Amino acid sequence: MMMTKQKNTLADRLNIGGEVRELRLGATFNPKNSSTAFHTIKYDFKPASVDPNRMAAVDVGSNNQVTVTVPNLENSGVPHTVYKGNQRKYAKECLMIYDKETGAITLEKLNHNIQVKKTRSEMTHHKPSFLPATNINHNNIPMSTNGSGPGPGPGPGSGPSPPLSGSASGSGQKLENSTMRISSKTKVSTGSRRNNIIDFKPRNSPMQQSSPSRPVASHRSPQSAPAWNANNAQQTLPSIPMIMDDDDFGLGAALHNGTGGGQANISGSSTGSSTGQPDYGGGGSSSSSTMHRQRQVPQHGQHGKRQQMHQNHQQHPSPPMHQQQQQQQQQQHYGRGINNGGGSNNYAQQQQPQQHHQQQEQQRPSSSSTYSHHSNNMPMDLDFPRENDLTSQTMAQAGAAIEEQIGGVLSASSSSSESDSSDSDSGSESDDSTDDESRPMQQQQLPNLGLGSISPSYNNHQQLQQQPPQQQQQQQQQQQYNHHMQQQHQPQQQHHHHHQQQQQQQQQSDMYTSNRGFPNDLLQNDLQLSSNSSDDDDD
């Protein structure tokens, strides 16, 4: 099929037809012929810019090297296209030539087979300018390329030809560009590496700790830790003397208290010291205070902060309205304790005179210890001399009025005590039962007054200390006289209620004196009640 197809195409192309024609041999078959030769050239690529109307030049050099220069179109921008290759001889290859005018067919013998490839040297028209550039580039190649050999030079040819020079210049230009790119890349790469090492190291890079260029950071890290520990040690030092002061004060207060449950409370309850009531749980308070100190030992910082907050609270005292409310609350608490547990006071009056004397002796050093406690822990109250002067004046006036009232009450009660003292003996059994109930209520009421009532309670305590000793002696004499009269007479149940009211009124008057006195209306009411009770006793 292939042969028939080729034959068909050949007959069609030549328009020979089916006729038999004569075949002639050409001059190449003549051995004496030396002027005519036929060669074949095979191109790998033929661009569209080649001009078919112009003749090409073939240059055959030594070692069968052939250079073919084909002209291009004028508008292509490149004047020539250069091909290079080699040649070899044909052994039994022929060429048939058909003449269209005469119709003759001639057979010629082929001499050489030439195969060429296109070279990329289109800038041949700048030959004079590029020749010295090529020499300079060849001289600079070993310097710029770090030991790399020069590029491949042009192949050997038969003399200087324009296509050859153009190709050499084109290769030189390529080498120049390549070496410039390589050198620029190496410079940029080395520069970027140095910048990475120098510039980015201080900016939190992972090489900052392991790099040998910064050994200072590694040496500074062990020195910073002891400095921090030293600072912490200095911060914990100020809390040690405060704990030692508390311990020393606790021991001093314990020595002042003795073995009997006195009035001084180490935990700082100012209400117990201001009211003058005995502390039935003195041993328990001292043990609780020691346990409280043991709990405070591992918390130095918190203890210091709490003291600072407490001092700030003391430096900013509450307004007068707040103090008045606190005083009213204290009066209500004491009124409840008297109404609910009045038997405790009767129980205290029914004790022997020796026990009263011992308790009073214990109250005096304990009150001094509580006063020292307040003076040590509360420097803020000493900053108000005006209030102290006013309270001292009011206490002096109230003391004088109370002495006159107590004298009248004693004269009125002396006539009725003979008939009324027996009633207290009959009610002593009931009072003993209520005494046990009044003690826990007093213990519950005392801790309810916190740090908010320290300043008024401290003033009340100072007022108690400023009372005249004559008033205290009169109260002691009254208690001893009542106790002596109670043991001598028989019980009478008719006037027992009036006698309890009289005792409660006396206790309330004592409580009001401890709280900066009481109004004149209450004094008049007490005098009227006492006079009424004396009239009832006479009836």
Swiss-Prot record:
Residues 151-163 have a biased composition (Pro residues). It holds the Pfam family EAF. Disulfide bonds: none annotated. The modification Phosphoserine is found at S205. It is found in: Nucleus. InterPro entries: EAF_fam (IPR027093), Tscrpt_elong_fac_Eaf_N (IPR019194). The keyword Phosphoprotein applies. One of its GO terms (biological process) is cellular response to heat. Keywords: Activator, Developmental protein, Nucleus, Phosphoprotein, Transcription, Transcription regulation. GO terms for molecular function: transcription elongation factor activity. Residues 132-146, 174-195, 220-238 have a biased composition (Polar residues). It comes from the Eukaryota. One of its GO terms (cellular component) is nucleoplasm. Residues 119-539 are annotated as: Disordered. Transmembrane segments: none annotated. Its main location: nucleus. Residues 420-435 have a biased composition (Acidic residues). Residues 267-278, 309-337, 345-375, 461-493, 520-533 have a biased composition (Low complexity). Belongs to the EAF family. PANTHER family: ELL-ASSOCIATED FACTOR EAF (PTHR15970:SF2). Promotes transcriptional elongation by Su(Tpl)/ELL. Essential for development. This is Ell-associated factor Eaf. It comes from Drosophila willistoni (Fruit fly). The gene is Eaf.
